[in-house]
């Protein structure tokens, strides 16, 4: 316990002194204000606590699958239809929890387009099955932004066993999500989250890779399409090869429409057919070497 720092509460009275396990997540100033990690507080008598207001706005919805398409070899874009007349009042950078029932799913039933099947066949991934005996819940960040109304959009990477340990069980929730087809029902709850942009004029630097695209897309679309922000911002995205890039037309359009926004992609394993002349390597290194190292005040940026 105490490792994720997500269960913050404000203790008004009771609970004893803050524990060393909490100090990685809570500053001395926050501790003086009563901030604690709920999982680390021993309840031995009556206490007075204050919970974040957004917790009381959490609801549950049964959604319908609009589409569930591959955007990369191991990433699907799941689009869910919110029930008519309902809204999920999330902020960019937020997440929902998705529920999956007990199931037995065969990877051989997955719909994987021909262009992405090479690696699936190479690593014999269609042999796997996901067997789950109880309901499960997992969290996923929204890829859409608040003004893409009526939907929830997720980028979900299938959690296959690693090549050096092929006998471990595959990811339970990602297997369920990859099995979903148009018209299927899916239950979500939310919204949750604290990964929100600050209301300042500081430069924004977004960095992500793979399915980490989701909150980056949500944030950037929200800044440029809803808020019409004039803040200087850049997006640095990492993918294995050109085939693993997605949403590039969207970001190209945003860059063309907004002179304050640029985006870059680095490929860690470009293929000969890619004819790639852009950045190569891991995106965090590319960001440092080609931008932050010579930036006049990287500490003033918001990441």
UniProtKB/Swiss-Prot annotation:
Source superkingdom: Bacteria
Entry EC no(s): 7.2.1.1
Localization: Cell inner membrane
GO biological process: sodium ion transport
Cofactor note as given: Binds 1 [2Fe-2S] cluster.
Cofactor needs: [2Fe-2S] cluster; FAD
UniProt domain 2Fe-2S ferredoxin-type: residue ranges: 1-55
Any GO molecular function: metal ion binding
Cross-referenced PROSITE patterns: 2FE2S_FER_2, FAD_FR
Enzyme class: translocase
Cellular component aspect of the GO annotation: plasma membrane
Pfam family, one: NAD_binding_1
Keyword Signal listed: no
All residue ranges annotated as the FAD-binding FR-type domain in the record: 58-198
Keywords associated with the record: 2Fe-2S, Cell inner membrane, Cell membrane, FAD, Flavoprotein, Ion transport, Iron, Iron-sulfur, Membrane, Metal-binding, NAD, Sodium, Sodium transport, Translocase, Transport, Ubiquinone
Positions that bind [2Fe-2S] cluster: 4, 7, 39
InterPro entries from the UniProt entry: 2Fe-2S_ferredoxin-like_sf, 2Fe-2S_ferredoxin-type, Beta-grasp_dom_sf, Cbr1-like_FAD-bd_dom, FAD-bd_FR_type, FNR_nucleotide-bd, NqrF, OxRdtase_FAD/NAD-bd
Catalytic activity, reaction form: a ubiquinone + n Na(+)(in) + NADH + H(+) = a ubiquinol + n Na(+)(out) + NAD(+)
Region Catalytic: start-end pairs: 201-303
Database matches in Gene3D superfamilies: 3.10.20.30, Nucleotide-binding domain of ferredoxin-NADP reductase (FNR) module, Translation factors
Similarity comment text for this entry: Belongs to the NqrF family.
The protein's assembly and partners: Composed of six subunits; NqrA, NqrB, NqrC, NqrD, NqrE and NqrF.
Known function: NQR complex catalyzes the reduction of ubiquinone-1 to ubiquinol by two successive reactions, coupled with the transport of Na(+) ions from the cytoplasm to the periplasm. The first step is catalyzed by NqrF, which accepts electrons from NADH and reduces ubiquinone-1 to ubisemiquinone by a one-electron transfer pathway.
The protein, known as: Na(+)-translocating NADH-quinone reductase subunit F
Organism lineage: Bacteria, Pseudomonadati, Pseudomonadota, Gammaproteobacteria, Vibrionales
